[in-house]
Amino acid sequence: MYTLLSGLYKYMFQKDEYCILILGLDNAGKTTFLEQSKTRFNKNYKGMSLSKITTTVGLNIGTVDVGKARLMFWDLGGQEELQSLWDKYYAECHGVIYVIDSTDEERLSESKEAFEKVVSSEALDGVPILVLANKQDVETCLSIPDIKTAFSDCTCKIGRRDCLTQACSALTGKGVREGIEWMVKCVVRNVHRPPRQRDIT
């Protein structure tokens, strides 16, 4: 009887854990996106003041529960010298969120180069990628078609994995929930990367 009840409890309350990398150049808005995600999906999370967010040196970690999935976010620093550390996390991850500052046209080619390295990595084969064109609340930002055109060289390297380019404003929260919900659907159905662990709450 205990085994039956224990199994039922696990079935009803377990969370499948998925590791999601948040990548992109410095000042693209990765940490702001992470904070907005935690605020939108964790009822009791107060969150830090978005005006106090500074450039990430190293790693920020956050957790969000969406249905039966638990997303463990790893927000990695985007400075050039830190990008060499990104691939150390690839084997463990189930999905990638790549954040682009759509107001910074001068660094767009630099962002594309970094993205190209990400999608070219064999360690990320089949891993879904959400490309967020961030800062869409700014009038002078590049549009989604502009971003897609600038990154068109990378299309063939994306392969058969799930990939979505979406407008977002991490500051206002627009597009945050939609992006996370899309990622959850992708990681849950990706049989090539099963959940990292079972976590019972």
UniProtKB/Swiss-Prot annotation:
GO process terms (BP): gastrulation; Golgi to plasma membrane protein transport; intracellular protein transport; protein localization to Golgi apparatus; retrograde transport, endosome to Golgi
Positions contributing to GTP binding: 24-31, 75-79, 134-137
**Protein's UniProt keywords contain Nucleotide-binding:** yes
A single GO molecular function term of this UniProt record: GTPase activity
Q: Where in the cell is it found?
A: Golgi apparatus; Golgi apparatus, trans-Golgi network
Q: Which domain of life is it from?
A: Eukaryota
- Keyword hit for Cytoplasm: no
Gene Ontology CC? cytosol; Golgi apparatus; membrane; trans-Golgi network
Tissue localization of expression:
Found in most tissues.
Which positions carry N-acetylmethionine? 1
Keyword annotations: Acetylation, Golgi apparatus, GTP-binding, Nucleotide-binding
The protein's job, in short, is: Trans-Golgi-associated GTPase that regulates protein sorting. Controls the targeting of ARL1 and its effector to the trans-Golgi. Required for the lipidation of chylomicrons in the intestine and required for VLDL lipidation in the liver.
Q: Which family does it belong to?
A: Belongs to the small GTPase superfamily. Arf family.
Alphabetical list of NCBIfam families matching this protein:
small_GTP
Assembly, per entry: Interacts with SYS1.
Protein name according to UniProt: ADP-ribosylation factor-related protein 1
Naturally occurring in which organism (per UniProt): Rattus norvegicus (Rat)
